[in-house]
Amino acid sequence: MNRIFLNIGILLSALAVTVSCGSDEAEQDVPVQPDKPDVEEKIQANVLTKAASAVVSTRVDVGMYMQHYVDGKMVDLYAAHNYVNNVRMKYAADGWKSAEPVYWYDESSLSDIYAYAPYQSEVEDCRNMAVGVPTDQTSTEQFAAADLLWGRNLALNPTTSQISVSLNHLFAKVNVKITPEADFAEGELKASDLKVFINNVRCEGKLDLQTGDVTLSGDPQTVCARNNGDLSFTVIVMPQTLGFVNLIRVEWGDVVYVLQRSIAFDSHRSYDLTVSINKKEATGLNIGISGWDIDDKDYGGVVE
């Protein structure tokens, strides 16, 4: 029996990441691993970066799982001990490399492949993975670590050709743009003097790697956004619907501006929030969607 290496390709963009990987599901006896075939072929991992804004492309690693079919039937992912279980893909100067060789189960069995990022070194249960966003996202590393990506490719035939799994953003991105009104002198309001926070969002949850479903847990918290310069700030939040709450807080020295708003943050959407402020208060808000997915709804409002 020839042993066929899995040829893995990762495509990273603002909308998706492509990876090939594999995994299994749930409460069944774990299949016996086959003997290693004689012929080995080195894994190839190719990366195409379609958008320079895809921070994940080089800053985080990808984890992958694979599960093979038994008697022609799909097998769910187990909590652990899948055929390919949380193999790490790491970016190097010459492309993505797996921490260990990855093979198809045999020359005929179909396989399902699952992938996620950022990589977690210890996953006790891939059907109930702890995920979340840091409450401090002021650094590029913290921001990249908050962007959870997931994807799968099912019922794959063994092949020496490259296969891909599209990884989608499971969380939402919020871009806040501060616009000073006429009572500010030109250049008076500087990004370095501002801090922006998203309030009342839950930051913890669980991921089912097989389905991509995320469930929230924990109490609402406040997240500090990354300062992009030019009076713009960005933060990653988990998908959730907020009632009428103190949504955005902007701090300019001793002056605090608060926006009260109800909003639904959906997976793989990027929300552009433009907040107008004068020296006394925030006077207005316009919200649109861009970047990952487009939502043309105008959420406009008044901030006090």
How would you name each of these model-derived features?
Residues 2-7, 18-304:
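Sec-type signal peptide cleavage vicinity
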Residues 13-17:
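Hydrophobic core
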